[in-house]
């Protein structure tokens, strides 16, 4: 079942940090909702999440992205089973948002 954002976050209160691997199609909404309930967020997302003018305007132009932790090896994700990278492996990263941070993010390779 595909969950809507409200079904996942309706009962979320205030936290210091959120660590999540959100559904890609709702990732922007998770970040925006995360700013309402936590100071810091770490989200495992495709590296391509950093692309796009609309996402830049709504998220990245606010300067709250503190760090980008880029996996040096591509990752294959299939139903929680770790596998050898294949041709359809994807570039992933951890994005670290901090709503009190204002500035340019630092890049890290992991």
Regions found by a protein language model. Give the residues of each.
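Class I S-adenosyl-L-methionine-dependent methyltransferase catalytic core
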Residues: 1-110
